[in-house]
Structure formats: structure tokens, C-alpha cells
Amino acid sequence: MQAVQVKVLNPKITEDKAFSLPTRATDGSAGIDLRACIDEPLTIKAGTTHLIGTGLAIYIQDPNFAGMILPRSGLGHKHGIVLGNLVGLIDADYQGELMVSIWNRSLEDFVLNPAERMAQYVVVPVARPEFEVVTEFSDTSARGAGGFGHSGRQ
């Protein structure tokens, strides 16, 4: 995979020590943390969503990969802060600012601070099959057309 390009859209990312360019927290980290690029603390009321900029654009280029914005497990478990769209899928050819939909699913207000880590970004491989329109499938699977709850609890 070729290098993924990162464009800094907000100068405070390179000028303010509270902010930083995205890096992996450890050698084993799958992704990078995305920080809230906001000027002042933002109160996210219980049950509401806010669209928060990261101040970054990430251009993958290679169509065999995509970016995924995922919630941070600690924020979700401890504070009920997850993504409004649950998972953000970022196409390889997208060049705009990465925005994060933050949803406070808890019963209490949450204060998001400037430069706070709010989500994570992971690059994943993408299968790009050709699609063939058919009138019947070439064979029958054990599941067939069984839908919701078909293979588990009824």
C-alpha cells in the first residue's frame, strides 16, 4: 500500500501543543486517534448529536482500501459517547475534512474539550467484486432466504 496523505486544514494542529498530528498510540494500535478540532469546550446534551471537525483531510488514494471512523471504547462504555452513524466509512478518493458525528446516548450531558480524542480512524482492505445479475443463484446455501433470527434465538 502506498503512503496515505494527511492534509492539515486547521493550523492549530501544528501550532498548539494540545493538538498533534495523528499517530498510533502503541506499536500494536490498529488506528490513529481523531481529536476534536474545536476552540472551546462543547457540551453535548444527553440524547443529542454534534458534527465535529478534526481539522484533517486524509486521502487514501488506493481504491483497494477505505477508512473507517470508529468510536473509542472508553468513551462509549464509560460516558455513552458513540458515533451518530455508528461507523463512518470514508472512501479512498475522499479529500475533504474528516468530520465525526458524536452522539451522547447517555442520560447525562458530556463536555467535549478541544483536542480531546473522540474517535479512531482505521484503514481497512476493500474487496471490489464484479456483480453479476442472475434470475436464480447457482447453488442453494444451507441458510437460503432465512432472515432475522433464523439461525439463533427466536
Curated annotation (Swiss-Prot):
Entries under CDD domains matching the protein: trimeric_dUTPase
GO BP annotations listed: dUMP biosynthetic process; dUTP catabolic process
Classification via InterPro entries: dUTPase (IPR008181), dUTPase-like (IPR029054), dUTPase-like_sf (IPR036157), dUTPase_trimeric (IPR033704)
Positions of substrate binding: R72, S73, G74, N85, L89, I90, D91, M99
Enzyme class: hydrolase
Coiled-coil zones: none
Listed Pfam families: dUTPase (PF00692)
Assigned keywords, A-Z: Hydrolase, Magnesium, Metal-binding, Nucleotide metabolism
The reaction(s) this protein catalyses: dUTP + H2O = dUMP + diphosphate + H(+)
Family per record: Belongs to the dUTPase family.
Protein name: Deoxyuridine 5'-triphosphate nucleotidohydrolase
Gene: dut
